[in-house]
């Protein structure tokens, strides 16, 4: 038996990797099996290698990890979005995950949407892994009352600051002209990522908002409105991304409330590691 080889995928290995994942995962993942998603996330550069790292022994794949680039730096930040090991080879999966930063020369390796029962594996690797809180900002009920939200007894809206407006960014060119605000968040998302993710995504559409003060760009807030037709009853607004310093976020509370009101939404929600 030969030594275990940990390496990046090569051009033309797409079908082999997809077959391995489909054979060893308990569901057919849309990111792998829908061509539009696969090309957007893993194969967006024609002729290049798909964005996967592999653990291989005697020519057989034992683990595959698909990654998403957050920026185009020579030392990029990445997300691991698919991590599948062959049955009986979980240890190999841990070895591959531990080797990813070196294989990619990555500054930050992150992972979201992990299963709760895998947190212990990330802890073993020295990562921080935990459940993200889910935050809500209530709007107002319609004539039929609350249809999606179930407000508790202590759900009166908290007061918010209202000193910074939101200005819509109409397209990717306008985003490039504005540039990037300072942000300490990781993974670091550059303009290439933001333009692709929020102006060229194959399915959902997003609203990108600039937060400015005295001519200076402080942040971007990205929202998505889920329509009444999509929910079956009332609209919902989601704050899906925030690029900027944490101290700016509370200052757009009034502007977010206006978005909520203008959309006729019952609530605005977001997942976040912590809102100051």
Give short role names for the model-derived ranges.
Residues 43-47, 106, 126, 147-149:
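Alpha-helix boundary/capping detector
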Residues 68-141, 231-276:
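Acyl-donor binding region in acyl/amide transferases
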Residues 137-159:
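C-terminal "cap" of GNAT-fold acetyltransferases
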């Amino acid at each position: 038996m030969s030594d275990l080889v940990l390496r990046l995928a090569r051009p033309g290995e797409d079908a082999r990797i997809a077959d391995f994942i489909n054979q060893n995962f308990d569901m057919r993942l849309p990111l792998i099996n829908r061509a539009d998603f696969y090309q957007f996330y893993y194969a967006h550069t024609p002729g290049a290698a798909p964005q996967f790292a592999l653990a291989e022994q005697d020519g057989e794949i034992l683990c595959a990890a698909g990654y998403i680039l957050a920026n185009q730096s020579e030392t990029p930040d990445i997300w691991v979005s698919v991590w599948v090991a062959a049955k009986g080879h979980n240890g190999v999966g841990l070895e591959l995950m531990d080797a990813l930063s070196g294989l990619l020369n990555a500054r930050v390796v992150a992972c979201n949407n992990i299963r709760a029962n895998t947190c212990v594996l990330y802890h073993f690797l020295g990562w921080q892994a935990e459940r993200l809180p889910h935050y809500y900002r209530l709007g107002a009920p319609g004539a039929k009352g609350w249809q999606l939200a179930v407000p508790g007894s202590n759900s009166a809206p908290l007061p918010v600051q209202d000193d910074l407006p939101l200005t819509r960014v109409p397209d990717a060119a306008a985003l490039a002209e504005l540039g990037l605000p300072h942000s300490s968040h990781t993974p670091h998302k550059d303009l290439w990522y933001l333009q692709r993710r929020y102006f060229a995504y194959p399915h959902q559409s997003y609203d990108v908002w600039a937060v400015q003060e005295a001519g200076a760009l402080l942040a971007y807030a990205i929202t998505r409105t889920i329509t009444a037709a999509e929910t079956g009853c009332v609209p919902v607004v989601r704050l899906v991304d925030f690029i900027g310093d944490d101290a700016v976020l509370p200052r757009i509370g009034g502007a977010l409330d206006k978005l909520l009101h203008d959309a006729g939404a019952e609530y605005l929600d977001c997942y976040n590691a912590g809102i100051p």
